[in-house]
Amino acid sequence: MLIPPINLHAWIEEHRHLLKPPVGNKCIQQDGFIIMIVGGPNARTDYHYDEGPEWFFQLEGEMVLKVQDDGVARDIPIRAGEIFLLPPRVPHSPQRAAGSIGIVIERVRLPHEQDGLQWYCPQCNHKLYEAMFPLKNIETDFPPVFDHFYRSLALRTCSQCGHLHPAPERYAAVED
């Protein structure tokens, strides 16, 4: 049975209150493609690794897509009305401004593929930690990996320069 068309503007207005921290992300379809509406602000310090491409369409406001490009950290600004196709296997960290709303489309993962979350030292860009896992549900699979990294001083301390990667406030009292 075919799913009827979704009035995207009406959907956003009806669900705008859900497109805010701490999650800010709502999946509207998962049949062949994962289609998400994402709102800002956010303050992610992780980089997502996806075996497939990701398509970004910025509807309202602006975002910066931080990427690791051949070992170099780069910023790619994406403004309202702009689209960007991120190639497969490029670590990326979406930074969304307050009040911004965008669409992200990813393909459903193939059975053998794994997603990853990576963290890099903000001082010297050395990779601090990487976790690879089969992604089933982006809203429930990411938080345990975030918890593992942010609760560990050892994982957050750069072996190259000694800098301690910052953790969100909610982790301040639970560090090892």
From Swiss-Prot:
Gene3D superfamilies: Jelly Rolls. GO terms for biological process: anthranilate metabolic process; L-tryptophan catabolic process; NAD biosynthetic process; quinolinate biosynthetic process. Its cofactor is Fe(2+). It is an enzyme of class 1 (oxidoreductase). It catalyses: 3-hydroxyanthranilate + O2 = (2Z,4Z)-2-amino-3-carboxymuconate 6-semialdehyde. This is 3-hydroxyanthranilate 3,4-dioxygenase. O2 binds at residue 44. Transmembrane segments: none annotated. SUPFAM superfamilies: RmlC-like cupins (SSF51182). One of its GO terms (molecular function) is ferrous iron binding. Homodimer. PANTHER family: 3-HYDROXYANTHRANILATE 3,4-DIOXYGENASE. The keyword Acyltransferase does not apply. Belongs to the 3-HAO family. Pfam families: 3-HAO. InterPro entries: 3hydroanth_dOase (IPR010329), RmlC-like_jellyroll (IPR014710), RmlC_Cupin_sf (IPR011051). The lineage of its organism: Bacteria, Pseudomonadati, Pseudomonadota, Gammaproteobacteria, Lysobacterales. The gene is nbaC.
